[in-house]
């Protein structure tokens, strides 16, 4: 573990001590009320004919595996890279609201990030995109609760 990573981990542990156990449980309770089911990978780069892409697993500092895709620029590698983070409650493929319940509780639309990756790779960018913990195919952590950055940086 690098010294920068150790410093960040120490800072996170110190911040966690500042939040009372009671407040922490209140936040967990509120999060459980609005927690939506995990989005799933309903499309991959093959859908739009992207070539040379592959799955990879990114190990995090706390051991939770983050599942990802690396998609090279059309025509081969370039020196440009976009790291694409998805929004909540989505995954690296997007949002499957168009599949109906239980995902259409938020909205019944499809949000297609894979098409955006196609535009980026066609424009000469390599794309690295991954599922946040507790989303898509990445590992579960923190009781399935999203910390909105409190834990995810690890």
Predicted regions and their residues:
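N-terminal targeting or regulatory segments adjacent to alpha/beta-hydrolase or S9 domains
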Residues: 1-47
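Short acidic, glycine/Ser/Thr-rich loop/turn "cap" segments at secondary-structure junctions
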Residues: 32-34, 95-103, 139-144
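N-terminal cap/lid segment of alpha/beta-hydrolase-fold proteins
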Residues: 36-81
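Histidine-centered divalent metal-coordination motifs
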Residues: 67, 86, 135
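Short, surface-exposed "cap/lid" segments of acyl-processing enzymes
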Residues: 73-123, 127-129
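Alpha/beta-hydrolase active-site loop
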Residues: 112-116, 145-154
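Glycine-rich "HGGG/HGxG" loop immediately N-terminal to the catalytic nucleophile
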Residues: 118-119, 134-146
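A charged, solvent-exposed segment within the mature domains of Sec-exported extracytoplasmic proteins
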Residues: 130, 135-138, 152-154
